[in-house]
Amino acid sequence: MSSNFFDLNEIMTTKFPVSDELKEAVRVLRAGGVILYPTDTVWGIGCDATNHKSVERVFEIKRRPSSKSMIVLLDNMGKIPNYVEEMPDVAWDLVKYATEPLTVIYQKGKNLAPNVVGEDGSVAIRITHEEVSRSLCRMLCRPLVSTSANMSGQPSAATFGQISEEIKAAVDYIVPLRQNEHNTPSPSRIVKLYNDGVFKVIR
């Protein structure tokens, strides 16, 4: 079956956890909606990273300049070549052996909404190992936008309770999972990778 279509029966037979909450989130994403969901770092605002209009809404909700690109989540490193023009050999080791959330900026993105890709053509991708965001990526069969759940220029919301009511009211669906956790996660490490294999630590 093509990954461009959503078959609920097929998803229900997969071997990863599927809850009604996750199925509803995927329905919203497939319809072009925007969700609020937990990730491997802070809570995020997300949408289908291949849908230009959905990404545009995320920018509007955050009041973020469209010149600033956003991070894309995938559930499996084997999918990265589907969304970058070139993946240097060193990238595999960087991603495979990362001991904490790692966002890699690749020089040239592809098969993504144009407003996800940076003005220079680059794209920031992270492989998530967190259960909710990873399951959403698998079920959606597409990359997921991940940007912190705050207005542009404001501090990131480390916990669900710190997310503003304005943000909550602006999204189409709030994933009702992991909302009671109070640990303070750290943002991901960020590495900029060049096609010749040279990389630079940004954060």
Region locations from a protein language model:
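Active-site-adjacent structural elements in enzyme catalytic cores
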Residues: 2-203
